[in-house]
């Protein structure tokens, strides 16, 4: 299959630039994965589509303020650092701009000098391995000095950092939010529990590769980025029990879905586990664990729209996207939601 088979027309004004004031009042498109039938709802109506005995799987990762603005020690030239993933205690794979100023041995200063960095190696696709020096706890220093690494298509400034976190975020480590989870409020989660639906958590730290378009002509040749995941025994047991009892396992977001399918493909069921996954799902993939998916509207030709197309069917998904454009849904990270059931 070709990447262009997953293309669609999107007017720029439909790319949401800011989150809604009330998380659960965004629009919700409900797509029947077998028939392609579409319904238009509000997100809090998701409650009507969840049944007692179902299990909702959420990703509790927390976005790091991973964008650092600093200067080169020698020249005082302005530099931008974007932390991608931790490779050791104080060492990170990092995107550095402008890259030509970031040679091995180059040193940089952030804030009033409370954070320093040195490039100690080169990594794939032009990123650098950077070692940081600081006093105290790195996460606290980052909280003071760092900015939220918003996707490139969001050009407006985010006034409140917490708007780019889910209400249940806990485990810091992501370079982007698991955006399907942004629509849930504490109140909605409580109502879901009261209805007899199990809510469980896993962790997958979202990397910037999630925004990378598929450049290869044939999608089968695309090399997927790796992301770290972790799942507890308690979560694994509840998911397996749900499947055995005939309930649905509903992934909240493509990140939860990727973790579930990684484990299903490796072990045939969900077990306590942690590691790295580069699973790539596109039409023809047979789902092992995920029965339904809550997700946002994704970029044309992205691996994420391919994943959704694998769960339903390419034509059905592209037709639903065409309807969403016509009905002026809001797209991408701060946009509206879709429930593929």
Curated annotation (Swiss-Prot):
Monomer. This is S-adenosylmethionine:tRNA ribosyltransferase-isomerase. It is an enzyme of class 2 (transferase). It catalyses: 7-aminomethyl-7-carbaguanosine(34) in tRNA + S-adenosyl-L-methionine = epoxyqueuosine(34) in tRNA + adenine + L-methionine + 2 H(+). InterPro entries: QueA, QueA_dom1, QueA_dom2, QueA_sf. The keyword Cytoplasm applies. Keywords: Cytoplasm, Queuosine biosynthesis, S-adenosyl-L-methionine, Transferase. Pfam families: Queuosine_synth. The keyword Transit peptide does not apply. One of its GO terms (biological process) is queuosine biosynthetic process. Its EC number is 2.4.99.17. One of its GO terms (cellular component) is cytoplasm. One of its GO terms (molecular function) is S-adenosylmethionine:tRNA ribosyltransferase-isomerase activity. Belongs to the QueA family. It is found in: Cytoplasm. Pathway: tRNA modification; tRNA-queuosine biosynthesis. SUPFAM superfamilies: QueA-like. Transfers and isomerizes the ribose moiety from AdoMet to the 7-aminomethyl group of 7-deazaguanine (preQ1-tRNA) to give epoxyqueuosine (oQ-tRNA). Coiled coil: none annotated.
């Amino acid at each position: 299959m070709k990447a262009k088979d997953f293309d669609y027309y999107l007017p720029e004004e439909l790319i949401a630039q800011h989150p809604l004031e009330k998380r659960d009042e965004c629009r919700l498109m409900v797509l029947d994965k077998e028939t392609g039938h579409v319904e238009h709802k509000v997100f809090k109506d998701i409650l009507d589509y969840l049944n007692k005995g179902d299990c909702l799987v959420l990703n509790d990762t927390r976005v790091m303020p991973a964008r650092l603005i600093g200067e080169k020690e020698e020249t005082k030239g302005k530099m931008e650092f974007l932390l991608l993933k931790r490779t050791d205690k104080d060492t990170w794979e990092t995107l550095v701009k402008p890259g030509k100023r970031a040679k091995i041995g180059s040193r940089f200063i952030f804030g009033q000098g409370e954070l320093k960095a040195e490039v100690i190696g080169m990594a794939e696709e032009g990123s650098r391995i950077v070692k940081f020096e600081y006093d105290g706890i790195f996460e606290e220093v980052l909280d003071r000095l760092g900015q939220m690494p918003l996707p490139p298509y969001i050009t407006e400034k985010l006034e409140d950092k917490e708007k780019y976190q889910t209400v249940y975020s806990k485990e810091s480590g992501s370079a982007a939010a698991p955006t399907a989870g942004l629509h849930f409020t504490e109140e909605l989660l409580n109502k879901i529990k009261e209805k007899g639906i199990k809510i469980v958590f896993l962790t997958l730290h979202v990397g910037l590769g999630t925004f990378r378009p598929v450049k290869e002509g044939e999608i089968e040749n695309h090399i997927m980025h790796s992301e770290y995941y972790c799942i507890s025994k308690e979560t694994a047991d509840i998911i397996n029990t749900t499947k055995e009892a005939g309930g649905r396992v509903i992934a909240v977001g493509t990140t939860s879905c990727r973790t579930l399918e990684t484990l299903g493909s490796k072990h045939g069921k969900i077990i306590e586990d942690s590691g790295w996954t580069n699973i790539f799902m596109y039409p023809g993939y047979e789902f092992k664990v995920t029965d339904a998916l809550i997700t946002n509207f994704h970029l044309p030709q992205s691996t994420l729209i391919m994943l959704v197309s694998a769960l339903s069917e390419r034509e059905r998904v592209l037709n639903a996207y065409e309807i969403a454009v016509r009905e002026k849904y809001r797209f991408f990270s701060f946009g509206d939601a879709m429930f593929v059931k």
